């Protein structure tokens, strides 16, 4: 797969502003930063005496991080580019992309190349390298369903390591890289398996409604139709981070057991829920937050978005600590009313 630039000595950027590298727009600073354009550059920094002993943080699009303070260490800006069809067989295409590739642009490229499958994940902010960490998902599809493998550099040793799905240990918005592997690896390339036998994934009512509004029979929808519908839905519901700082969905949709759900539904008959294959029930976190009266409310310059209660926004001048205080207030109220604990999606530093 082509990389954006060859291995070369890495220039260090002292006292580096991270404002442009996090979608909340927080003006945190790194003690030192480095732009990384190849796996070899990640590896070279493992042995570089200039940064020995420093904590390390890999940043892609910065769409899943909340800086509550400056980062007193080395920030590695993943700019590894490249995307290609690496092989195919009778059943599927295998496509690989660099960790620094923009996720949405990569999804659009797969469709332009006639390889559908990722269209439900359109317009999710961030990079290809961040997608496995979070096991991103939307509108009835999780990334893990099309994941084949990834390559990552172990930051402490510079070793290039291959991960299959089992080793990644994917869960709901979760993976090995958010648990035991947190902070240990930089994902430099991801390979996806896109089956040639494609059918539209249109189980979510929002997608079916958007297709109908466009005069498209859901059963005959093409991948591009689904892509366009998802993009339209997300643009209508979610603020553009360039206009209003945010990190997308701030809370995971909680999953509870059937007994707890039955008791909750007895008190809240109109609660929004989604039965899971294992018998548990997923709740809509946005609905819980809205019912607690938080939609559209602000604490200082941090606020809950007026159209989507799952999204916390920076109205201008908010700090990471302000957003975190708002998140804690929301979690407290949801727990008090529903007995359900919300888990935050972004990493707070």
From Swiss-Prot:
Its EC number is 1.3.1.98. GO terms for molecular function: FAD binding; UDP-N-acetylmuramate dehydrogenase activity. GO terms for biological process: cell division; cell wall organization; peptidoglycan biosynthetic process; regulation of cell shape. Its cofactor is FAD. Residues 26-197 form the FAD-binding PCMH-type domain. It catalyses: UDP-N-acetyl-alpha-D-muramate + NADP(+) = UDP-N-acetyl-3-O-(1-carboxyvinyl)-alpha-D-glucosamine + NADPH + H(+). InterPro entries: FAD-bd_PCMH, FAD-bd_PCMH-like_sf, FAD-bd_PCMH_sub1, FAD-bd_PCMH_sub2, MurB, MurB_C, MurB_C_sf, Oxid_FAD_bind_N. The active site is at residues 173, 249, 345. Its main location: cytoplasm. It is an enzyme of class 1 (oxidoreductase). Pfam families: FAD_binding_4 (PF01565), MurB_C (PF02873). Pathway: Cell wall biogenesis; peptidoglycan biosynthesis. Gene3D superfamilies: 3.30.465.10, UDP-N-acetylenolpyruvoylglucosamine reductase, C-terminal domain, Uridine Diphospho-n-acetylenolpyruvylglucosamine Reductase, domain 2. This is UDP-N-acetylenolpyruvoylglucosamine reductase. The gene is murB.
């Amino acid at each position: 797969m082509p990389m954006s630039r060859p291995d070369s000595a890495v220039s260090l950027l002292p006292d580096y502003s991270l404002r442009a590298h996090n979608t909340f727009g927080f003006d945190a600073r790194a003690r030192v930063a480095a732009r990384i354009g190849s796996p070899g550059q990640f590896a070279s920094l493992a042995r570089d005496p200039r940064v020995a002993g420093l904590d390390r943080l890999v940043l892609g699009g910065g769409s899943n991080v909340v800086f509550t303070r400056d980062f007193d260490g080395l920030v590695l800006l993943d700019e590894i580019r490249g995307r290609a069809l690496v092989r195919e067989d009778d059943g599927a295409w295998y496509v690989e992309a660099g960790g620094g590739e923009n996720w949405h642009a990569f999804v659009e490229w797969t469709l332009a190349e006639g390889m559908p499958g990722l269209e439900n994940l359109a317009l999710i902010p961030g990079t290809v390298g961040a997608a496995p960490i979070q096991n991103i998902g939307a509108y009835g599809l999780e990334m893990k369903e099309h994941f084949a493998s990834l390559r990552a550099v172990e930051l402490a040793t510079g070793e290039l390591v291959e991960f299959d799905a089992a080793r990644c240990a994917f869960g709901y918005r979760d993976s090995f890289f958010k648990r035991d592997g947190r902070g240990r690896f930089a994902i430099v390339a991801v390979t996806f398996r896109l089956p040639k036998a494609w059918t539209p994934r249109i189980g979510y009512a929002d997608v079916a409604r958007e297709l109908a509004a466009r005069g498209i029979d859901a059963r005959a929808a093409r991948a591009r139709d689904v892509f366009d519908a998802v993009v339209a839905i997300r643009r209508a519901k979610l603020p553009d981070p360039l206009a209003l700082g945010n990190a997308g969905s701030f809370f995971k949709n909680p999953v509870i057991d059937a007994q707890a759900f039955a008791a909750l539904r007895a008190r809240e008959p109109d609660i929004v829920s989604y039965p899971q294959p294992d018998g548990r029930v997923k709740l809509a976190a946005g609905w819980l937050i809205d019912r607690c009266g938080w939609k559209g409310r602000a604490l200082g310059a941090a606020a809950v978005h007026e159209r989507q209660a799952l999204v916390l926004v920076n109205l201008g001048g908010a700090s990471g600590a302000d957003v975190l205080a708002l998140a804690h207030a929301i979690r407290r109220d949801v727990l008090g009313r529903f007995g359900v604990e919300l888990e935050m999606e972004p990493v707070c530093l």
